[in-house]
């Protein structure tokens, strides 16, 4: 058997193991290293692709892309039988033959937007990998991941690690106190409305000082900025965060303390993000911090569908797919695939190169 035949046989075994996936899903699953962006329509199985990709990373590493021409005859015979359906699936033997640099589950950070989606991801991983391995994968929402980071490191920002997290009712009550502090009426500045503007500012990574600077001579904007500053002072005095602070302060932590960022960059060399079209600037920046800024070709895998964005009211930026702020550095021609055709297209990409798949 020639070297090329050995490589082809190994890759056919990969395709057999992941035969429940279509061709485009398999391409996404087997592209382990480097940045990958997948556009997937509703019902196209994007969550299935993410789950299968994590399984492939843990079981086989980069074995598909880096398959070599070495294959003992006994293994070649068994692989062919497996491909032909004459041998039962033996994951351990497949791993022994096919795996190259398998990835440790605790080095994978898988992010989604809702607790329900994160729970489904963990459950599906457990059904394939087993409870113990699946529990080692860091599958969570943006906010859950950031809370864990802040519990360990927020003292660097002047908070205690046992900080409270205010819900919407807590935030409104606090804003009423802030309105009293600056001697303006709730009728003129409804607490809910003010909090919504502050929330949008945090999602856009705008500080109270920046908001005040942007206000110019506009009285209402100046008062909102002032209330924003007073609100943050009260939160800090109470050792509390609101919901928006969770990601906002995590990004601030990483920007002010590069040594803390480095810990998480090296802990999570592989990052996967589902429903990325729903991300706003602060979330995009968080992912860029962890996966992008220190590395030439970050191992980040993003899946989404611009037509399904449901968080525009929170400044989600589905236009990311066309021209996002943190992918403007360079351009290149990169391979783009769909079910019915393959063609070359100019795509803005993460840093130096981004593989780009369309899954319909």
PLM region spans:
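A substrate-engagement module of RecA-like helicase motors
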Residues: 67, 73-91, 98, 153-181, ...
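Conserved P-loop NTPase-based nucleic-acid remodeling module centered on helicase motor cores
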Residues: 105-196, 319-323, 351
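Conserved P-loop NTPase motor "coupling/switch" region that bridges the ATPase
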Residues: 165-168, 325-335
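Coupling/switch/interface segments within P-loop NTPase motor domains and analogous charged loops
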Residues: 169-235
């Amino acid at each position: 058997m020639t070297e090329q035949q050995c490589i082809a046989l190994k890759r056919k075994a990969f395709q057999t193991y992941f035969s429940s996936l279509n061709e485009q899903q398999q391409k996404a699953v087997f592209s382990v290293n480097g940045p990958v962006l997948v556009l997937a329509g509703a019902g196209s199985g994007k969550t299935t692709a993410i789950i299968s990709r994590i399984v492939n990373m843990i079981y086989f590493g980069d074995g598909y892309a880096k398959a070599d021409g070495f294959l003992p005859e006994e293994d070649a015979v068994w692989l062919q039988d497996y491909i032909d359906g004459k041998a039962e699936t033996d994951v351990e033997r497949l791993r022994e033959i096919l795996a190259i640099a398998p990835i440790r589950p605790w080095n994978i950070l898988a992010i989604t937007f809702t607790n329900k989606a994160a729970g489904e991801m963990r459950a599906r991983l457990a059904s394939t990998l087993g409870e113990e391995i699946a529990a080692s994968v860091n599958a969570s929402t943006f906010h859950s991941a950031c809370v864990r980071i802040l519990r360990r490191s927020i003292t660097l920002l002047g908070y205690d690690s046992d900080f409270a997290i205010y819900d919407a009712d807590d935030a409104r009550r606090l804003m009423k106190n802030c309105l009293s502090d600056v001697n303006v009426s709730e009728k003129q500045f409804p607490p809910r409305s003010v909090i919504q503007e502050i929330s949008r500012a945090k999602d856009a990574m705008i500080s109270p000082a920046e908001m005040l600077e942007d206000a110019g001579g506009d009285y209402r904007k100046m008062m909102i900025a002032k209330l924003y500053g007073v609100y943050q002072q009260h939160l800090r005095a109470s050792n509390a965060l609101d919901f928006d602070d969770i990601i906002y302060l995590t990004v601030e932590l990483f920007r002010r303390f590069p040594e803390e960022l480095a810990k998480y960059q090296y802990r999570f060399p592989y990052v996967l993000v589902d429903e990325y079209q729903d991300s706003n600037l602060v979330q995009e920046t968080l992912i860029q911090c962890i996966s992008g800024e220190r590395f030439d070709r970050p191992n980040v895998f993003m899946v989404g569908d611009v037509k399904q964005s449901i968080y525009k009211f929170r400044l989600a930026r589905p236009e990311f797919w066309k021209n996002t702020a943190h992918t403007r550095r360079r351009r290149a021609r990169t391979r783009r695939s769909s079910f019915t055709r393959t063609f070359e297209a100019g795509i803005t990409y993460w840093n130096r190169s981004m593989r780009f798949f369309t899954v319909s």
